[in-house]
Design a protein with these regions (language model features):
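Glycine-rich phosphate-binding active-site loops on the catalytic face of alpha/beta enzymes
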Residues: 4-9, 109-132
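Catalytic beta/alpha-barrel core
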Residues: 1-11, 23-34, 53-57, 65-66
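Surface-exposed amphipathic alpha-helices with a cationic face
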Residues: 18, 41-45, 76-82, 143, ...
Length: 175
């Protein structure tokens, strides 16, 4: 179950998700503090569901160079205060394809437990999220870079089952 940023403080929904006994991905609200984010997770767990994964996806600021501002300082703060795993969504966290790779690398370096990245074989024709989606071959390259960073910060990444870069628009054909 994924609870998006706009529903992070929908307490009835959080409690219901807690009763579902399914893993819940909880995205941080657009202006939520660290405490509010963790307390939203508590609503889910108060119903007996401890399968909660947190996701930092950016907060609203006055910056105009990006759609949201990805708060990577949240990662070590959550890890200091909670046992819950925390992912980073650099796609929604920036809203811009060219920022996904560098912020993914930074998220891994700061200790994120995982990434949620938009990947599309032809982002310019995607029905949604195309502007923030990377191409499959870019994802392949990102994973190579992330593996190197993960090794430096002593994190483990499982080996992929298969490469997602099949059936993609060749780099030369991109706008």
């Amino acid at each position: 179950i994924q609870i998006g940023a706009r529903n992070m403080q929908n307490f009835a929904l959080l409690k219901r998700a807690g009763r579902a006994r399914k893993p819940v991905l909880l995205k941080r609200g657009m202006s939520a503090t660290l405490e509010e984010f963790l307390m939203a997770a508590e609503y889910i767990m108060s119903e007996g569901n401890y399968q909660v994964i947190l996701c930092e996806r950016g907060v609203r600021t006055f910056a105009d160079h990006t759609r949201n501002t990805l708060d990577l300082s949240l990662i070590p703060a959550v890890q200091r205060l909670s046992h819950l795993p925390i992912l980073v969504d650099p796609s929604h966290g920036t809203g811009k394809r060219n920022k996904v790779t560098p912020l993914s690398r930074a998220a891994v370096a700061v200790g994120a437990d995982g990434l949620m990245v938009e990947v599309h074989n032809n982002p310019d024709r995607a029905l949604s999220d195309g502007i923030q989606s990377i191409y499959p071959d870019q994802f392949d390259e990102l994973m190579k870079q992330i593996r190197q960073i993960a090794a430096v910060v002593e994190r483990y990444l499982p080996e992929p089952a298969a490469s997602p870069s099949q059936n993609t628009v060749p780099a030369a054909a991109r706008p």
